[in-house]
Amino acid sequence: MKKLIAIISLAIICSCSPVEEKTKETQMHADHSQTLDKGAHQPKSKSPKQMTMTTIEGNHIHIEYHSPSMRGRKIFGGLVAYNEVWVTGAHNATSISFTKDLEISGKKIEAGKYALFTIPDQKEWTVIINKNWEQHLADDYKQEEDILRFKVIPTIVDTPQESLTYKIENLDDLEGELAISWENLAIKFIIKNI
């Protein structure tokens, strides 16, 4: 009789355990589904945060930016004014960081994190590397914090670029080319390890 009671008790205990685990698992999935449903109803950012990166001979180069889209608008000379400092993205300043010193447009820049701004114009753009990468748009931009300014000539692209895009292409063991494109224009410049 004792054996029979022990077997029945063991069977009851074993049969109850999986039900509790399933209940906990079901509850966890229900909570997760609710979180997913809430997230599904939130609007997508019209200028999502993006990043591009590469490593050139051990130098990790990393760019973070917000990527606005054309959405039927005229960009250069419209949404983005000519001859004004532009964050070259949306929301916060675009940041560029690298783990080793490098050279841009003939100037040595120490490893670190910086803001990347531009001043678009119809014939020539000014590219700016600035110390203050933690700023909203160009609201706190100060020219005296620039560590580098140089000129580039924009090129017309064959296929319009709907969203602002940054790309870094490794050219060889020492150099890479940073390309920024949007609408029907692109600018490019060389980043070189020292």
Feature map (PLM): residue ranges:
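Positively charged n-region of N-terminal signal peptides that target proteins for export
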Residues: M1-L4
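Primarily secretory-pathway and cell-envelope proteins
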Residues: V19-L79, E84, A138-I194
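Sec-dependent N-terminal signal peptides
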Residues: A6-I8
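Short glycine-rich, polar/acidic loop-and-turn segments at beta strand-coil junctions
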Residues: L10, S67-S69, K100-L102
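C-terminal motif of bacterial Sec signal peptides marking the signal peptidase cleavage site
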Residues: I12-S15
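Mid-length scaffold segments of soluble, non-membrane domains
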Residues: V85-Q135, D140
